[in-house]
């Protein structure tokens, strides 16, 4: 099964950036933007993902864990 996550970031200048990730089972992605970074951990065996928003020093500003079923969708070929 293919899981795709799209992270959309609003930059301080009002522009948008987006990042896409294809996670087959378990992975962690680190994205840096506007002197902040986001760490996304995707674990399909537990059916959860975790997002941590950190400042440039690595201090966690916000963290949340959610059920994959909240965002799961179907895409056909």
Regions found by a protein language model. Give the residues of each.
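A short, charged, amphipathic alpha-helix used as a generic interaction element across diverse proteins
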Residues: 13, 23-48
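Intrinsic disorder/low-complexity detector
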Residues: 13-15, 24, 57, 69
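Short, mixed-charge low-complexity intrinsically disordered segments
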Residues: 39-77
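Eukaryotic scaffold repeat domains enriched in small/polar residues
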Residues: 19-20, 63
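Short aromatic-glycine-(Arg/Gly/Cys) micro-motifs in beta-strand/loop hairpins
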Residues: 1-19
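Hydrophobic beta-strand residues in large extracellular and virion-surface proteins
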Residues: 4-7, 23, 29, 33, ...
């Amino acid at each position: 099964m293919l899981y795709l996550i799209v992270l959309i970031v609003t930059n301080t200048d009002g522009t948008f950036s987006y990042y896409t990730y294809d996670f087959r089972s378990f992975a962690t992605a680190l994205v840096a933007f506007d002197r902040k970074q986001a760490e996304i951990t995707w674990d399909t065996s537990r059916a959860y993902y975790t997002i941590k928003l950190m400042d440039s020093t690595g201090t966690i500003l916000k963290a949340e864990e959610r059920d994959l079923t909240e965002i799961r969708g179907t895409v056909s070929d």
